[in-house]
Amino acid sequence: MKTLKLARRLISVLGVATLSLSAQAADLTFGYINGIDPIKRAIADGEYEKGIGQKIDWRAFDAGPAVLAAMASGDVQIGNLGSSPLAAAASRNMPLVAFIVSAQIRSSEALVVRDGSGIKTPEDLIGKTIAVPFVSTSHYSLLGALKHWNLDPRKVNIVNLTPAQITAAWSRGDIDGAFTWSPALGEIRKTGKILTDSAQVSNWGAPTFEVWVARKDFAEKNPKVVADFAKVSLAAIADYSAHKKDWTAASEPVKSIARLTGANAADIPELLDGSYFPSASEQKTAQYLAGGTASEIGKTAEFLKEQGKIEKVLPDYSGFVSDKFIGE
């Protein structure tokens, strides 16, 4: 119950936050989480500053809820987060718009159990301590896995830790397992085994994805900035898709991602392979920004409500998604 109360408190904070109107085009602050994707290479190499033509203050966050809090306060105008925190925020009518689906999460997020923990089957999770960043895509996937296994989440000691805290808690032996992403995932896999991952959970009916969102007031006043941001992002994805075999651990793109995120360069090619990155042409299709993304946000919200993480589900989430910034 304690973890459930913490999750509700976090969602409540996001829900009551209001967006100030202080953002100006000449003062850009963008936030990201340290998931592994081609866009991180563009951030590390300064391509957004070149493409947008302005100085950008980049801020790294531990997880999506922290990005949302910064956007709600007015500190950040454009941010990177997962489908679960987006669904929670949209259900509270936070004025945001998702304008890029940056990744369909597959094996890049996983539930790892510690060697020697005694966890060999899903049923062994009962009574064990499992860490996850609350209201994140990993949290959603963990709850989806427990539902698939017919396990009551209340019988598992689920604790709220950021990826960095997960790595530290793992090294101390404080937790038996964790559902997370890299760099933490790459570290804990060294002394643990994967029980399931987001690809498998997606097949069980709980898919997750990552997006870039803008504050609605900022997007309305600065559509070219948002469109230029999308252009740089999708060029980075296209470069990876066209030269995937060249993105080895010793390559410059992978070194750039490692420098930005702190992930081990040797792990990055496999982690990149653990997600699917929709192309510019795919973004505007019914599968993504032209309908599918809004539908998936709604399904995620329904699941979060079922799990007691949010209080209501909106009848329509299409107002939180737009494809108009693609190709402008």
Which residue ranges define each predicted feature?
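Bacterial N-terminal signal peptides that target proteins for export
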Residues: 1-11
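Cleavable N-terminal signal peptides
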Residues: 12-13, 23
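Sec/Tat signal peptide C-region and signal peptidase I cleavage site
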Residues: 19-25
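Short, glycine-/small- and polar/acidic-enriched structural segments
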Residues: 26-152, 157-160, 176-179, 198
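Ligand-binding pocket segment of bilobal, Venus flytrap-like solute-binding proteins
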Residues: 68, 76-80, 166-194, 215
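Periplasmic-binding protein-like
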Residues: 103-113, 194-219, 230, 317-327
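Secondary-structure end/capping motifs
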Residues: 220-309
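Hinge/cleft segment of the Venus flytrap/periplasmic-binding protein
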Residues: 302, 306-328
